[in-house]
Amino acid sequence: ITEGQHLFQVRDLKEYFADIDSALAQMHADGIDTIALMGHSTGGLISAYYLSENPDSPVKALLLNSPFLDWNFNGFMRKVAIPAFGALGRLFPDLAISQGDGTGYQESLLKKHHGEWNYNQDWKLFHPQKVDASWTRAISSAQNKIKKGAGIRVPILLMHSDKSVDGDHWTPEFQHADAVLNVKDISRIGRKLGQDVTEDTIRGGLHDLVLSSPPVREQVYNYIFSWLRQKHIF
């Protein structure tokens, strides 16, 4: 993120495909021909969307860490509000939409609160920032296309926590659950992304599984490398 750039300003998630293409081209130039693509949350949605739209990609496997495959809202929000925001995103792409003011997940990560990590909070914000209506539209569009049939050809490792936790304010449960997405949605949609999907449910995992407590993230990495060996990726 550089000066002048605006967070959550995107019209179509395909805008990110060029970044993936550039990375793949550079790896090919470096003589790397065995590539596994990994994505977390929105990055997981983008990664799945990319492989759905680019079936001839050189990527050999897809690893998904709590992918953002659906909105974690109630029925009214999903069926009425989100489509309405999407329509507004076409007409008023820069319209600002609140994400609320909850900081429970951030507190579960940061060392100065209840976590064990220090990171650049200009990049990973502590207080949720408003998003553009166009961003909401772009997310929904990609999710809907994925739900209709992603048809991803490569093996997929789908990972998520065993439970979700709701609320704006931190409680001890935030240290052992996904505080961002509904893990049932991840499972329901993720299992249909392709013909070869391995689902691993991580007991006590956070939304970003590799930022979970040491015993949990050790389990995550063991799953990843075991699966890669099993699929003869590396």
Task: Report residues per predicted region.
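Glycine-rich "HGGG/HGxG" loop immediately N-terminal to the catalytic nucleophile
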Residues: 1-10, 207
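Alpha/beta-hydrolase active-site loop
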Residues: 8-28
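Alpha/beta-hydrolase fold nucleophile elbow
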Residues: 30-41
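Alpha/beta-hydrolase-fold enzymes
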Residues: 42, 46-131
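Active-site nucleophile elbow and catalytic-triad environment of alpha/beta-hydrolase enzymes
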Residues: 127-148
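Short beta-strand/loop motif that positions the catalytic acidic residue
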Residues: 152, 158-160
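Conserved loop-alpha-helix segment in the C-terminal half of the alpha/beta-hydrolase fold
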Residues: 162-201
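Catalytic active-site module of serine/aspartate enzymes centered on a nucleophile-bearing elbow/loop
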Residues: 196-234
